[in-house]
Amino acid sequence: MDDVNTKTAAWADKRWQALLALDFSSRAGRTTLIGKRHQGPLVVQKMLYPEGDEVCHGIIIHPPGGVAGGDQLQLQATLEASARALLTTPGAGKWYKANQLSASQAVRFHLAANSCLEWLPQENILFDGSNVHFSSEIDLAEGAVFCGWDILCFGRQARGERWSEGELRQVMQVRREGRLIWNERLFAQPDSLVMRSGIGLKGMPVNGSLVVAAGTVPVEIIEACRAIEARGDAHYGVTALPEILSARYIGASSEAAKEYFERLWQVLRPWYAARPATRPRIWNT
């Protein structure tokens, strides 16, 4: 027992506590990053403007490349009225074996009136033995718009690795002027019913969700989204609620999931942002 406690303490000493807080403002039709707080290994690159001054693109980087047991990442973004930003990541997030400690990522976004934030990260890969807690809280003022997606890979598929040990806790909540309009929770272990059930993840190694909070979705947009098909062996679909549009992918390929969500984004963005989808340049590398 002493050896176990000693090893746990040693790992605790090495864990990262990372925080990145970003503040965006819109002045004279140009969105700029006006404030940044940074602690630990979580940084943002210089803002890019591939679609003009109104929308700035930011790339969130975690230099260590992977997240070990005990690491805690916090990403916060605050958008002032009418600001518009798109945030993404350069590559897949890697969540390593827990070593008796859980790792976490907490996302907190606050959007003022008529602002728009898109959070479109690459996939997260849960290594065998990982113990991970993801939480996302999005607070929207009147007229604010949020679009975000999340893709999880259970095990390193390219190596034939299965997620046979570990734990996942995932929570996402969206509020409009303090009122809860979306509340999604997932608790999974490799042998839990949710991983193999026909109403759960159906035994598939990749699970993805896309959420848009932008008010009532026009019928023609819903129909166009539902006409999009995901390739390969997959289960997918689009659900329209009074204040939320959500899409789900359950399948065997993270690339197919990203492709499916990007095609949905190409249909949705002209509606909620009044501009065509412009791929972040980092996606082409």
Swiss-Prot record:
GO terms for cellular component: cytoplasm. It is found in: Cytoplasm. The keyword Cytoplasm applies. Disulfide bonds: none annotated. InterPro entries: UreD (IPR002669). Keywords: Chaperone, Cytoplasm, Nickel insertion. UreD, UreF and UreG form a complex that acts as a GTP-hydrolysis-dependent molecular chaperone, activating the urease apoprotein by helping to assemble the nickel containing metallocenter of UreC. The UreE protein probably delivers the nickel. Belongs to the UreD family. Required for maturation of urease via the functional incorporation of the urease nickel metallocenter. This is Urease accessory protein UreD. The gene is ureD.
